[in-house]
Amino acid sequence: MVDDAGTAESQRGKQTPADSLEQLRMLPLPPPQIRIRPWWFPVQELRDPLVFYLEAWLADELFGPDRAMIPEMEWTSQALMTVDIVDSGNLVEITVFGRPSVQNRVKSMLLCLASFHREHRARAEKMKHLEKNLKAHASDPHSPQDPVA
């Protein structure tokens, strides 16, 4: 037989998710990430950025987790980019710095990739819906089974 003191003592060692969240809130915020202009990027091209918006889920597809692909994209395109979350996480603001021709090329490339990912997601959802319907049809005992030739 277990007494109440023993159970209370064993529960003290365990942390609930709420306790963990409180401990995280007590920690100081990390310092802001400071970006230094790369040596290959001219200062005068920081003056007139190109800004456009995409859905937040697309930013994860395009730039990878934690925006890890941005430095490589910047290097290959010779443009600087910032990706900031706006509109309570539904949209991201993409700012492209560089020569106007480079800005337009980067925007075009990102919009083409976004279109590809939208189509891919729509096809995946359509396939899931089709599979669900086929499983429901196959499990229905009243549906006539077509003989396979």
UniProtKB/Swiss-Prot annotation:
Residues 1-23 are annotated as: Disordered. InterPro entries: KH_dom_type_1_sf (IPR036612), KHDC1 (IPR051778), MOEP19_KH-like (IPR031952). GO terms for biological process: actin filament organization; embryonic pattern specification; establishment of spindle localization; establishment or maintenance of apical/basal cell polarity; positive regulation of double-strand break repair; positive regulation of double-strand break repair via homologous recombination; positive regulation of meiotic nuclear division; protein storage. Pfam families: MOEP19. Disulfide bonds: none annotated. Residues 49-110 form the KH domain. GO terms for molecular function: RNA binding; structural constituent of cytoplasmic lattice. It is found in: Cytoplasm; Nucleus. GO terms for cellular component: cell cortex; cytoplasm; cytoplasmic lattice; nucleus; protein-containing complex. Residues 8-18 have a biased composition (Polar residues). Gene3D superfamilies: K Homology domain, type 1 (3.30.1370.10). Keywords: Cytoplasm, Nucleus. Its main location: cytoplasm. Contains an atypical KH domain with amino acid changes at critical sites, suggesting that it may not bind RNA. Component of the subcortical maternal complex (SCMC), at least composed of NLRP5, KHDC3, OOEP, and TLE6. Within the complex, interacts with NLRP5, KHDC3 and TLE6. As part of the SCMC interacts with the SCMC-associated protein NLRP4F. The SCMC may facilitate translocation of its components between the nuclear and cytoplasmic compartments. Forms a scaffold complex with KHDC3/FILIA, and interacts with BLM and TRIM25 at DNA replication forks. PANTHER family: OOCYTE-EXPRESSED PROTEIN HOMOLOG (PTHR19447:SF14), OOCYTE-EXPRESSED PROTEIN HOMOLOG-RELATED (PTHR19447). Belongs to the KHDC1 family. Component of the subcortical maternal complex (SCMC), a multiprotein complex that plays a key role in early embryonic development. The SCMC complex is a structural constituent of cytoplasmic lattices, which consist in fibrous structures found in the cytoplasm of oocytes and preimplantation embryos. They are required to store maternal proteins critical for embryonic development, such as proteins that control epigenetic reprogramming of the preimplantation embryo, and prevent their degradation or activation. This is Oocyte-expressed protein homolog. It comes from Papio anubis.
